[in-house]
Amino acid sequence: MNLERVSNEEKLNLCRKYYLGGFAFLPFLWLVNIFWFFREAFLVPAYTEQSQIKGYVWRSAVGFLFWVIVLTSWITIFQIYRPRWGALGDYLSFTIPLGTP
């Protein structure tokens, strides 16, 4: 989609939809929101909807960073402690690696 062909109101509406969609456990939408609207929020000359778009982009960045930290922490903890959790670790695993820990 070419954002230059879209009205400022429609840009704001689309940015808001991607921001709200990220709350449905879809942090990828926040990343898309950041990439698509960063230029509109911070680099183009000012217009009336820009401050709202800027807010959505900032909040999308914070939400995406939060999800990256949470998922990285969980993956690290799970990879390190899964063998110690015994049956629970096996139950949470999609595939169980062969061999000894």
Curated annotation (Swiss-Prot):
User: Outcome of residue 36 to A?
Assistant: Decreased APP processing by the gamma-secretase complex
Q: Which residues lie on this side of the membrane: Lumenal?
A: 79-101
Which GO BP terms sit in this record?
amyloid precursor protein catabolic process; amyloid precursor protein metabolic process; amyloid-beta formation; membrane protein ectodomain proteolysis; membrane protein intracellular domain proteolysis; Notch receptor processing; Notch signaling pathway; positive regulation of endopeptidase activity
Q: Which InterPro entries match?
A: Gamma_Secretase_Asp_P_PEN2
UniProt key word Membrane: yes
**One Gene Ontology cellular component annotation?**
Golgi membrane
Q: What is the effect of changing residue 10 to S?
A: Induces a N-linked glycosylation on N-8
The record's tissue-specificity note reads: Widely expressed. Expressed in leukocytes, lung, placenta, small intestine, liver, kidney, spleen thymus, skeletal muscle, heart and brain.
Locations listed in the record = Endoplasmic reticulum membrane; Golgi apparatus, Golgi stack membrane; Cell membrane; Membrane
Q: Does the keyword Transmembrane apply?
A: yes
Q: How does it sit in the membrane?
A: Multi-pass membrane protein
Q: Where are the transmembrane segments?
A: 58-78
GO MF terms listed in the record are: endopeptidase activator activity; enzyme binding
The alphabetized UniProt keywords are: Cell membrane, Endoplasmic reticulum, Golgi apparatus, Membrane, Notch signaling pathway, Transmembrane, Transmembrane helix
Q: So what does mutating residue 26 to A actually do?
A: Decreased APP processing by the gamma-secretase complex
Q: What does this protein do?
A: Essential subunit of the gamma-secretase complex, an endoprotease complex that catalyzes the intramembrane cleavage of integral membrane proteins such as Notch receptors and APP (amyloid-beta precursor protein). The gamma-secretase complex plays a role in Notch and Wnt signaling cascades and regulation of downstream processes via its role in processing key regulatory proteins, and by regulating cytosolic CTNNB1 levels. PSENEN modulates both endoproteolysis of presenilin and gamma-secretase activity.
The entry describes its oligomerization and partners as: The functional gamma-secretase complex is composed of at least four polypeptides: a presenilin homodimer (PSEN1 or PSEN2), nicastrin (NCSTN), APH1 (APH1A or APH1B) and PSENEN.
Q: Which disease is it linked to?
A: Acne inversa, familial, 2, with or without Dowling-Degos disease: An autosomal dominant form of acne inversa, a chronic relapsing inflammatory disease of the hair follicles characterized by recurrent draining sinuses, painful skin abscesses, and disfiguring scars. Manifestations typically appear after puberty. Some ACNINV2 patients also exhibit reticulate hyperpigmentation consistent with Dowling-Degos disease.
Family listed: Belongs to the PEN-2 family.
What name goes with this protein?
A: Gamma-secretase subunit PEN-2
Gene symbol of the encoding locus: PSENEN
